[in-house]
Amino acid sequence: MRAVVQRVTNARVTVSGRTVGQITRPGLVVLVGVTHTDTVRQAHALAVKVHELRILRGELSCAQTGAPILVVSQFTLYGDTRKGRRPSWDAAAPAATAEPLIEAFVAELRRRGAEVATGVFGADMLVELANDGPVTLVLDVD
């Protein structure tokens, strides 16, 4: 699994003009991609890493502060641009594989006590955020 984690002051996701998920105070936006070989174990490991990642102000984590997390599925994180000018999406898992793993990631965050908002899996979403810092990290879990 791959995640792009951004420290934000606020963020929201809209689908067809309707807000489906938002955080209104400082926290994290996590864009999550899934590849073919990913497992529930990896989803849980990524959730632990994100929840305990000390990138909030004061070198604190969401686990320590209760800061909210907005999770957005994003298959394009596995886009391959090594050949030509049109990305290949072959490394991205199909929806039937990816959606349950995104759900497992979110469920593990919530099980750990995180306040989690989400986008809509597979939807055409508009993600608005105020990146704080900016602080942006790419996490890969094998």
From Swiss-Prot:
<dbReference type="GO" id="GO:0005737">
    <property type="term" value="C:cytoplasm"/>
</dbReference>
<dbReference type="GO" id="GO:0000049">
    <property type="term" value="F:tRNA binding"/>
</dbReference>
<keyword id="KW-0820">tRNA-binding</keyword>
<comment type="similarity">
    <text>Belongs to the DTD family.</text>
</comment>
<dbReference type="GO" id="GO:0043908">
    <property type="term" value="F:Ser(Gly)-tRNA(Ala) hydrolase activity"/>
</dbReference>
<dbReference type="GO" id="GO:0051500">
    <property type="term" value="F:D-tyrosyl-tRNA(Tyr) deacylase activity"/>
</dbReference>
<dbReference type="GO" id="GO:0106026">
    <property type="term" value="F:Gly-tRNA(Ala) deacylase activity"/>
</dbReference>
<dbReference type="Pfam" id="PF02580">
    <property type="entry name" value="Tyr_Deacylase"/>
</dbReference>
<feature type="short sequence motif" description="Gly-cisPro motif, important for rejection of L-amino acids">
    <location>
        <begin position="133"/>
        <end position="134"/>
    </location>
</feature>
<dbReference type="GO" id="GO:0019478">
    <property type="term" value="P:D-amino acid catabolic process"/>
</dbReference>
<protein>
    <recommendedName>
        <fullName>D-aminoacyl-tRNA deacylase</fullName>
        <ecNumber>3.1.1.96</ecNumber>
    </recommendedName>
</protein>
<dbReference type="InterPro" id="IPR023509">
    <property type="entry name" value="DTD-like_sf"/>
</dbReference>
<keyword id="KW-0378">Hydrolase</keyword>
<dbReference type="InterPro" id="IPR003732">
    <property type="entry name" value="Daa-tRNA_deacyls_DTD"/>
</dbReference>
<comment type="subunit">
    <text>Homodimer.</text>
</comment>
<keyword id="KW-0963">Cytoplasm</keyword>
<comment type="function">
    <text>An aminoacyl-tRNA editing enzyme that deacylates mischarged D-aminoacyl-tRNAs. Also deacylates mischarged glycyl-tRNA(Ala), protecting cells against glycine mischarging by AlaRS. Acts via tRNA-based rather than protein-based catalysis; rejects L-amino acids rather than detecting D-amino acids in the active site. By recycling D-aminoacyl-tRNA to D-amino acids and free tRNA molecules, this enzyme counteracts the toxicity associated with the formation of D-aminoacyl-tRNA entities in vivo and helps enforce protein L-homochirality.</text>
</comment>
<keyword id="KW-0694">RNA-binding</keyword>
